[in-house]
A protein has these predicted regions:
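Extracellular/periplasmic, surface-exposed regions of secreted and cell-surface proteins
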Residues: 1-95, 105-443, 584, 588-667
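Glycine-rich, aromatic-lined ligand/substrate-binding cores of catalytic
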Residues: 74, 497-532
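Extracytoplasmic gating/loop element in the C-terminal half of outer-membrane beta-barrel translocons
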Residues: 44, 524-624
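Catalytic-site beta-strand/loop segments enriched in glycine and acidic/polar residues
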Residues: 155-163, 198-207, 476-499
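Conserved small-residue
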Residues: 261-293, 400-498, 538-540, 548-549, ...
Length: 667
């Protein structure tokens, strides 16, 4: 894959921060244009600044051995699997940039344009890099399946082990060269009597190299029971239209061994080991022979170090604390469900109520007492201290019906969930609403906006806001704690969570003779997100740039500018325009909170299968012409960009809308 030498982020910024009249694409004399700020126009950024070449190599190898063992006992089977995968990524980036010129305001005496070079040509530079990893997987499984008249028994005993190791870009940290490994034994026993009563038991005994000895293995049992009422004789005799009516309950435990650093993406390896480094920079106090560095660790030198310039010997210190008690994060799950099929399977329904109690969630101990000896700059220890309770409903249904020569199918699915942070390592606060405990995961929090300041009298009669200078037309916030000051102490839960709590879909399919039509809708709800970025904060960096028409039309405007008091609307959609930014207006608050709900026509497919006699004459088995459209329509209260992008500023790559026309021919 090839792309510009400038990143997509830089190109988008070029588009957002310039107007179409800022500069031409190129000057007629071949000069590359820029403005007074030295910016590059989007065309130059995309086509004239080198290129970045990337390629990926992936090899997957799988070997499976399947051996029946009926000579030992009927129904016994052995399966062995081995997998070996390698993934490699490489890039070569060659970057250059032409000299940039701006046209002066005044022409030369002969009438020609006078150009000033703003930046010299940047000659080609080259950088390269690569990443790679190797994965191995081994599995040995014994399966048993046997029917004893009305009794059906099955079982599985499985041994697994896997390994993943980096093969490139491992740096100088020895931990990067060590493989991540798991080893486990799992089993399952399933019994049902006459497809009426069901009983299952599962277990997993899994080990992870990421924990200290004695904490590496976890035992994760599970069981389920079910009763298919439709198989009871009185139902089969009197309610023949009931094909299946199964009620079920399951309970189980699952474990997680993955811990991440504060960025949320980098895995933490071996949290049970201390990390040791040298003491910090010299910080001599008096004429002591040994002294403690401001950054931790003892530094040693001869007496009179400053006077005689003797060598400094740095001592060692802990740079991160260990916790040899860290072990598996465990979720205990309960599920009550119903599976139903009626009218010769024309109507089917599956619905589940789930309840999950997740304990021992990994998190940094950020609020340890000073007596613990944790110093500034040290990596804090992780511990199993978090707890989250989740519950919700999940279901899907379908209905099939023949109407004349038309075959109709309607379907739908929905997941509605809710969670609560029950325990978290956070500091107690006099204002409980500032804590995350008691609220939902990813709960949107911010200030409550009361509108915009109308005038200076309104400002004088309102609590002081501590986020920088403000004036009429700026956002006015609520003093939640009543202390007369608007600060971070006034941030509360507002709106929903930033991740949808409701996800659903619905569709309909129809077939008539050779014509088939399929529609699928996708939706999400119960979510909120904050908007920011240059789209709603024009001129935030004090530079020239584009401005959205909605921002211009919907902003607060002083009567001195408009000539009418009506434009000083305290309920305006946007605050006054400001050059160089306004920290007061850029706080996360209900003013910038938006509803993330949407419904999308995800897929529309129309196809036509040619009649069989015609296809036979063409010496084919089947011919179908089709048209598929994806992401064709979206309905949402939010209109600025696609709410499914999960972006606060719209500067992410959007979902593509596509129409595909195709032909399938089977010979």
């Amino acid at each position: 894959m090839n792309e510009s030498g400038m990143t997509s982020h830089e190109i988008w910024n070029s588009i957002l921060n310039q107007t179409p009249t800022s500069m031409p694409i190129m000057y007629s004399n071949g000069y590359t244009p820029t403005n007074s700020d030295g910016d590059i126009n989007p065309w130059v950024a995309s086509t004239q600044c080198g290129y970045n070449e990337q390629w990926w190599n992936n090899i997957q190898t799988n070997i499976t051995l399947n051996q029946k063992l009926d000579f030992i006992t009927k129904g016994l089977n052995f399966i062995g699997r081995f997998g070996f995968d390698t993934d490699n990524y490489n890039f070569i980036k060659r970057y250059k940039c032409p000299a940039l010129w701006s046209a002066d305001r005044f022409r030369k005496d002969d009438g020609t344009i006078n150009f000033t070079r703003k930046r010299a040509e940047q000659e080609m530079t080259q950088t390269s890099g690569n990443t790679g990893e190797r994965k191995e997987y081994f599995e040995a499984e014994l399966q048993y399946n046997r029917n004893f008249k009305s009794h059906i028994l099955s079982g599985t005993l499985k041994y697994t082990q896997d390994s993943k190791v980096k093969t490139q870009e491992i740096g100088n940290d020895i931990k990067n060269s060590l493989p991540m490994r798991h080893q486990g034994l799992a089993g399952r026993i399933a019994y049902n009597w006459n497809y009426r009563y069901f009983l299952n038991f599962n277990f997993g005994y899994t080990g992870s190299e990421n924990f200290a000895a004695g904490h590496q293995f976890g035992f994760f049992p599970a069981y389920s029971v079910a009763w298919n009422i439709a198989e009871e004789p009185f139902v089969k005799k009197n309610l023949k239209w009931v094909n299946m009516f199964k009620v079920r309950y399951s309970w189980g435990k699952v474990g997680n061994d993955k811990m991440y650093e504060a960025n949320g993406t980098t895995l933490i390896r071996f949290p049970y080991l201390y990390t040791i480094g040298y003491g910090g920079a010299p910080n001599i106090w008096g004429d002591n022979a040994g002294y403690y560095s401001a950054f931790g660790g003892y530094n040693w030198a001869d007496y009179g170090y400053e006077k005689y310039g003797t060598t400094l010997f740095q001592g060692l210190r802990y740079t991160s604390y260990a916790n040899d008690g860290v072990t598996w994060e465990i979720a205990t799950k309960h599920d009550i469900g119903l599976d139903m099929s009626l009218f010769d399977d024309k109507f089917t329904l599956t619905i589940d109520y789930f309840h999950e109690d997740r304990k021992g969630i990994f998190m940094y101990r950020r609020y340890l007492p000073a007596t613990a000896g944790v110093e500034n700059g040290m990596t804090l220890p992780q511990a199993n201290v978090g707890k989250v309770l989740s519950k919700g409903v999940d279901g899907n249904l379908a209905y099939k019906q023949q109407v004349g020569s038309v075959q109709l199918t309607m379907r739908g699915n929905m997941t509605l969930s809710k969670n609560e942070v029950k325990d978290k390592d956070e500091q107690n606060n006099v204002y409980p609403y500032l804590m995350e405990q008691g609220y939902r995961v990813n709960q949107a929090k911010g200030l409550i906006a009361l509108g915009l300041f109308k005038d200076y009298t309104d400002i004088r009669n309102s609590p002081q806001q501590t986020f920088g200078a403000y004036q009429p037309g700026d956002i006015k916030y609520k003093d939640v704690n009543g202390d007369g000051i608007i600060s971070d102490m006034d941030r509360v839960a507002i709106g929903a969570t930033t991740v949808p709590n409701l996800i659903y879909g619905m569709g309909i399919s129809a077939q008539w003779k050779g014509l088939d039509v399929n529609l699928h809708f996708q939706g999400a709800g119960k979510s909120s997100f904050f908007i920011n970025g240059s789209g709603v904060r024009p001129f935030v960096n004090g530079s020239k740039g584009n401005i959205l028409k909605d921002v211009v039309a919907g902003r607060w405007i002083s009567r001195d500018e408009s000539g009418t008091e009506s434009t000083e609307n305290v309920r305006a959609e946007y605050p006054r325009l400001s050059y160089g930014g306004s920290n007061n207006n850029y706080q996360e608050s209900s003013f910038w909170l938006r509803d993330g709900s949407y419904v999308r026509l995800k897929t529309l497919e129309i196809g036509y299968t040619l009649p069989k006699p015609l296809v036979n004459k063409m010496h084919f088995n089947n011919v179908r012409i089709y048209l598929i459209g994806t992401n064709l329509l979206t309905w949402s209260k939010f209109k600025m960009w696609d709410p499914e992008m999960n972006s606060s500023n719209g500067a992410a790559y959007p979902l593509s809308k596509s129409i595909t026309v195709g032909l399938n021919v089977n010979l």
